[in-house]
Amino acid sequence: MARRPRRSDSSSAEPTLSPQHLLALVRSTIPPIHPAGRPFIAAGLAVAGVGYRHRWARRTGLLAAGACAGFFRHPPRVPPSRAGAIVAPADGVICVIDTAAPPAELSMGDAPLPRVSIFLSVFDAHVQRAPVSGEVVAVQHRPGRFGSADLPAASNDNERNSVRIRTANGAEVVAVQVAGLVARRIVCDAHVGDKLAIGDTYGLIRFGSRLDTYLPPGTEPVVIVGQRTIAGETILADLP
């Protein structure tokens, strides 16, 4: 009886796990770290290294490094393809939906605009993303207090940084980074004249904070208070 010929093509080979494939799997599973977090992680690892002979110091350093790695994580996001969508600029929970005048330092007048506020706990990713595609026409920082970011007064009293973005059709959306009780450092990489695509990372607030998004007049939010948001993906509203 004739034997079936042995297949010599590559499809019969046993699958192998190459170093390149393993590295790709790790990168797809573990999100990258925002550059602002690297000094904090390095400090934790340094404590663990210096005190490696002492269990408490080693564990404390490793725990701090791991916590900072989680806090400063920068996970990839896929913005919606729907035209005119305004997405959440931050991960967190919607704490306020109301109307309010935009920050005075932007010189946009006193007329109230629809506003959606997102509270970020220390467990949320703290990178901020552009809510719409457009050009940055104003960036204004205003010093202030460091009260609890979940209180209504935080928007007016706390330190904040406002980024005003003008879309291609002329509509304007304002994203305001608000410092909190623990968050005492606002990082903003956006500058006047920058062109941002929806979902682009433009900043970060360290250790708990709040994000206020001021929408164009006539915009109707499609989210509710208490809803969790994913930065760059959750749709807050549609441009009018």
Swiss-Prot record:
Its main location: membrane. It comes from the Bacteria. Is synthesized initially as an inactive proenzyme. Formation of the active enzyme involves a self-maturation process in which the active site pyruvoyl group is generated from an internal serine residue via an autocatalytic post-translational modification. Two non-identical subunits are generated from the proenzyme in this reaction, and the pyruvate is formed at the N-terminus of the alpha chain, which is derived from the carboxyl end of the proenzyme. The modification Pyruvic acid (Ser) is found at residue 209. Its EC number is 4.1.1.65. This is Phosphatidylserine decarboxylase proenzyme. It is found in: Cell membrane. The active site is at residue 209. Binds 1 pyruvoyl group covalently per subunit. GO terms for biological process: phosphatidylethanolamine biosynthetic process. Pfam families: PS_Dcarbxylase. InterPro entries: PS_Dcarbxylase, PSD-A. Belongs to the phosphatidylserine decarboxylase family. PSD-A subfamily. GO terms for cellular component: plasma membrane. Its cofactor is pyruvate. The record marks 208-209 as: Cleavage (non-hydrolytic). Keywords: Cell membrane, Decarboxylase, Lipid biosynthesis, Lipid metabolism, Lyase, Membrane, Phospholipid biosynthesis, Phospholipid metabolism, Pyruvate, Zymogen. Heterodimer of a large membrane-associated beta subunit and a small pyruvoyl-containing alpha subunit. It is a peripheral membrane protein. Pathway: Phospholipid metabolism; phosphatidylethanolamine biosynthesis; phosphatidylethanolamine from CDP-diacylglycerol: step 2/2. It comes from Mycobacterium ulcerans (strain Agy99). GO terms for molecular function: phosphatidylserine decarboxylase activity. It catalyses: a 1,2-diacyl-sn-glycero-3-phospho-L-serine + H(+) = a 1,2-diacyl-sn-glycero-3-phosphoethanolamine + CO2. NCBIfam families: PRK05305.1-3 (NF003679). Catalyzes the formation of phosphatidylethanolamine (PtdEtn) from phosphatidylserine (PtdSer).
